[in-house]
UniProtKB/Swiss-Prot annotation:
SUPFAM superfamilies: Composite domain of metallo-dependent hydrolases, Metallo-dependent hydrolases. Keywords: Cytoplasm, Histidine metabolism, Hydrolase, Iron, Metal-binding, Zinc. Zn(2+) binds at residues 73, 75, 243, 318. The lineage of its organism: Bacteria, Pseudomonadati, Pseudomonadota, Gammaproteobacteria, Alteromonadales. GO terms for cellular component: cytoplasm. This is Imidazolonepropionase. It comes from the Bacteria. Transmembrane segments: none annotated. Fe(3+) binds at residues 73, 75, 243, 318. The gene is hutI. The keyword Methyltransferase does not apply.
C-alpha cells in the first residue's frame, strides 16, 4: 500500500456511530493516512502489507487516538479583561446588574474598539495555541465585541487571518447582535436595522463569516429582533445559530428550530417544548459548563430531556472575558460530567462528532472514518474516560492535522 504515514500500537476511539463498541472503540488497532485523509483503519491484525522502509511509522505505545477536538463556541478574540467584574460578582452583583450598568460585554467592546488588528491577532494566537496544545484542531470564533461596523469587521478579519496562519481550522461567526451598544441604548430596533442593512452586507462582501448568531435574552435582543437578524442571514445563505435560554426562557430555541438553526447555545432554561422543537429540526444543543460554573448558576440544562428526545449534545468552552474566561476544552470534558452529569462518552462526543454537526462539517471531521480529514490526537491514557476524569496534566502527545504531524 502507498500511504503517507501509518500509526500502530494504538487504540482508536473513532466516535463513529456505526462501530457498536463504546466510543466507537477499536483496540489493538492501526490507522493510515494518505493525502491528508484517513486511508485505512482497523485492527492491527488486518493491516495490509506496506513498505515499512519508505512509509513513516509512528508507534503509539498503547495510547488512544481520538478525532481532533472541536471547540464549537468561543469568543476568542478580545482585548482587556474583566477581573474587576469578577470581584463585583463575588460581592453580590449579578451578571444582569453588571450588564445594565454598561459593564459586561460593553466594557470589552470599549477595549476592542481601541485595539488594532495586530494586537488582537497576537492575543488570539496565544489563546489558539493554548487550545491546540489540548488537541483542538477546529475552533469557532465569534465577533460581538465591536457593536459597530468597523470593529465587527476588524474582529472577523483577525479571525480569518488566524485561520490562515495557524494549523487549527477557524470557523467564523458574525455576532453583531451580542448586546445593545451605548449609542443605541434607547433605540435597539435602530441597532437591528444597522446590523441588517449595513453590518451584514459588509461582512458578506468580505466573506468574513460562515454563520450568524444572536444573543436572544431579556438583557439583549427580543424574539422579533432575533428573527429579523437570523432571517436576513439565512436569506443571504449563511448558517444561523443562537444564544438562548441562558438566563430566562424566552422561546428562542423554538424560534431557532423553526428557522433551521445549526445550534442553540447555553439553554439552561430550555423547557420540554423547546427540546422537542430542537429534536424535530435536528438542531444541536450546545452546553457551556464553563459559563455555568464561572457565573455560579444553579439552573442546569435539561440533560435528561435532551437524551430522551435524541438531541445532539455539544460541549464547548464559551471562552470569553466575562462569563467563561477558561481557555480549556479538557476542563469542559470534566465539567460536562461533574456539573451536568454527562457520561464521559457523551462529553467526548460533544467535543468531536456533535461539535462537527453544530458547525455543519460532520461530513469531513468529528470522527475517525475512512475518507474523512486526517485530524486526530494521540493521548497517553489507558481509557478514553480518563480525558474527562482527570485534569491538570495534559495527556495530549501528538496531533495530526490534515495528515501532518503538527504537535509532538
Amino acid at each position: 500500500m502507498s500511504w503517507d504515514q501509518v500509526w500502530i500500537d494504538v487504540n482508536l476511539a473513532t466516535m463513529d456511530p456505526s462501530v457498536s463498541a463504546p466510543y466507537g472503540a477499536i483496540t489493538n488497532a492501526a490507522i493510515a493516512v494518505k493525502d491528508g485523509k484517513i486511508a485505512w483503519l482497523g485492527p492491527r491484525s488486518e493491516l495490509p502489507a506496506f513498505d515499512v522502509l519508505s512509509i513513516p511509522v509512528y508507534r503509539g505505545k498503547g495510547g488512544w487516538i481520538t478525532p481532533g477536538l472541536i471547540d464549537a463556541h468561543t469568543h476568542l478574540i478580545f482585548a482587556g479583561n474583566r477581573a474587576n467584574e469578577f470581584e463585583l460578582r463575588l460581592q453580590g452583583a449579578s451578571y444582569e446588574d453588571i450588564a445594565r450598568a454598561d459593564g459586561g460585554i460593553i466594557s470589552t467592546v470599549k477595549a476592542c474598539r481601541e485595539a488594532d488588528e495586530a494586537e488582537l491577532f497576537e492575543l488570539g494566537r496565544q489563546r489558539l495555541n493554548a487550545l491546540a496544545k489540548e488537541g483542538v484542531t477546529t475552533v469557532e470564533i465569534k465577533s460581538g465585541y465591536g457593536l459597530d461596523t468597523e470593529t465587527e469587521l476588524k474582529i472577523l478579519r483577525v479571525a480569518r487571518e488566524l485561520g490562515k496562519h495557524h494549523h487549527v481550522d477557524v470557523k467564523t461567526t458574525f455576532l453583531g447582535a451580542h448586546a445593545i451598544p451605548p449609542e443605541y441604548k434607547d433605540n435597539s430596533d435602530g441597532y437591528v436595522d444597522l446590523i441588517i442593512n449595513k453590518m451584514l452586507p459588509a461582512v458578506i462582501a468580505e466573506n468574513l463569516a460562515d454563520a450568524v448568531d444572536v444573543f436572544c435574552e431579556n438583557i439583549a435582543f427580543n424574539l422579533e429582533q432575533t428573527e429579523r437578524v437570523l432571517s436576513a442571514a439565512k436569506a443571504a445563505g449563511l448558517e444561523i445559530k443562537l444564544h438562548a435560554e441562558q438566563l430566562t426562557n424566552m422561546g428562542g430555541s423554538a424560534l431557532a428550530a423553526r428557522l433551521g438553526a445549526k445550534s442553540v447555545d447555553h439553554i439552561e432554561y430550555l423547557d420540554e417544548a423547546g427540546v422537542k422543537a430542537l429534536s424535530e429540526s435536528g438542531t444541536c444543543a450546545v452546553l457551556l459548563p464553563g459559563a455555568f460554573y464561572f457565573l455560579r448558576e444553579t439552573q442546569k440544562p435539561p440533560i435528561d430531556l435532551l437524551r430522551q428526545y435524541g438531541v445532539p449534545m455539544v460541549l464547548a468552552s464559551d471562552f470569553n472575558p466575562g462569563s467563561s474566561p477558561i481557555c480549556s476544552t479538557l476542563l469542559m470534558l470534566n465539567m460536562g460530567c461533574t456539573l451536568f452529569r454527562l457520561t464521559p462518552e457523551e462529553a467526548l462526543t460533544g467535543l468531536t462528532l456533535n461539535a462537527a454537526k453544530a458547525l455543519g462539517i460532520e461530513d469531513n471531521v468529528g470522527s475517525l472514518v475512512v475518507g474523512k480529514q486526517a485530524d486526530f490526537c494521540l493521548w497517553d491514557i489507558a481509557t478514553p474516560a480518563q480525558l474527562a476524569y482527570s485534569y491538570g496534566v495534559n495527556p495530549c502527545k501528538d496531533v495530526v492535522k490534515n495528515g501532518k504531524l503538527v504537535h509532538q
